[in-house]
From Swiss-Prot:
Protein name: RNA binding protein fox-1 homolog 1
The species this protein was found in: Mus musculus
Tissue expression profile of the protein: Detected in brain (at protein level). Detected in heart, brain, neurons, skeletal muscle and embryo.
Transmembrane segments: none
Ranges of compositional bias, category Low complexity: 87-98
């Protein structure tokens, strides 16, 4: 019996040995960190630490598990705050969107209530405004109907203006492409045409009446820049008595002075109706004195300086007194003197380059020599005037 008791004691002591082996595990105060978060950053537990050292694993687990639950609660609180703020902002944003549908219908109603114009093309040519009004009047109130016409009749298109744009759109959808009297009409929205103001171009040269093209016809001497040979007095004229002489004047191109009208009147004497602009009434008065300083002819009326042209001899034989001539002259310089058939005036038969070289008799020998010296220049000038003034309607 004693032996059995000793064995039992030995077994009990041997069984008590593991109690001593459990002490090293009690020194561990913290469990390994979870979710990769170091242990020193974890929030301290608000409860005091337990006084007993046994069974420390349970408070250790509670100590380690509590901070994640606290962070989760904080995150959930943050997310809840975010969701609340998000819903608040969404509601704030949704407020104007709720108000937009209220303004859009008003804008649509305003746009639909405005008048609208339609362009109707390819309509029958016999259509008139009442026909077009009857065709479109079934869709709504029409303010205006207009069909475009020219001198030959309808141009086949027009415009219809509706009081309400919705009626205009409905009429356009219904009538576009329909066939009326064999013609497929087209109805479209009329667009406003942009009207641009064209800049007016001054057609005059140097500020006076003749442009370069017309000036080359009516005053070739001004554009050629040649030398004019003019007789200073009318040989044998009772209206003017003075020394017989020739005056040399240079025609300046583009000379904007009364010389332009003087040259036009100068040629108007032999052309009978061309170029005579202002000085028609000078036939009834004495000619003005010579003005050799100006680039043109000496006399402002071509009648008194026309001996330079031989073609004027056809008119001189029937020329009456100056007062009678003024009474029978019209605004174009035509003289209805003795011949009753002068209303069908044609160019004189002797009018030509060769006949134009025939001068009136000059008494002064010095004047004759001067005329011989410049004969070539005068011939070229007469030829240019003849081609430019007389044959201005010829094709070549």
């Amino acid at each position: 019996m004693n032996c059995e008791r000793e064995q039992l004691r030995g077994n009990q002591e041997a069984a008590a040995a593991p109690d001593t082996m459990a002490q090293p595990y009690a020194s561990a105060q913290f469990a390994p960190p979870q979710n990769g978060i170091p242990a020193e950053y974890t929030a301290p537990h608000p409860h005091p630490a337990p006084e007993y050292t046994g069974q420390t694993t349970v408070p250790d687990h509670t100590l380690n598990l509590y901070p994640p639950t606290q962070t989760h609660s904080e995150q959930s609180a943050d997310t809840s705050a975010q969701t609340v703020s998000g819903t608040a902002t969404q509601t704030d944003d949704a407020a104007p969107t709720d108000g937009q549908p209220q303004t859009q219908p008003s804008e649509n109603t305003e746009s639909k209530s405005q008048p609208k114009r339609l362009h109707v093309s390819n309509i029958p040519f016999r259509f008139r405004d009442p026909d077009l009004r009857q065709m479109f009047g079934q869709f709504g109130k029409i303010l205006d109907v207009e069909i475009i016409f020219n001198e030959r009749g309808s141009k086949g298109f027009g415009f219809v203006t509706f009081e309400n744009s919705a009626d205009a759109d409905r009429a356009r959808e219904k009538l576009h492409g329909t066939v009326v009297e064999g013609r497929k009409i087209e109805v479209n929205n009329a667009t406003a045409r942009v009207m641009t103001n064209k800049k007016t171009v001054n057609p005059y040269t140097n500020g006076w009446k003749l442009n370069p093209v017309v000036g080359a016809v009516y005053s070739p001497d001004f554009y050629a820049g040649t030398v004019l040979l003019c007789q200073a007095n009318q040989e044998g004229s009772s209206m003017y008595s003075g020394p017989s002489s020739l005056v040399y004047t240079s025609a300046m191109p583009g000379f904007p002075y009364p010389a332009a009208t003087a040259a036009a009147a100068y040629r108007g004497a032999h052309l009978r109706g061309r170029g005579r602009t202002v000085y028609n009434t000078f036939r009834a008065a004495a000619p003005p004195p010579p003005i050799p300083a100006y680039g043109g002819v000496v006399y402002q009326d071509g009648f008194y300086g026309a001996d330079i042209y031989g073609g004027y001899a056809a008119y001189r034989y029937a020329q009456p007194t100056p007062a009678t001539a003024a009474a029978y002259s019209d605004s174009y310089g035509r003289v209805y003197a003795a011949d009753p058939y002068h209303h069908t005036l044609a160019p004189a038969p002797t009018y030509g380059v060769g006949a134009m070289n025939a001068f009136a008799p000059l008494t002064d020998a010095k004047t004759r020599s001067h005329a011989d010296d410049v004969g070539l220049v005068l011939s070229s000038l007469q030829a240019s005037i003849y081609r430019g003034g007389y044959n201005r309607f010829a094709p070549y």
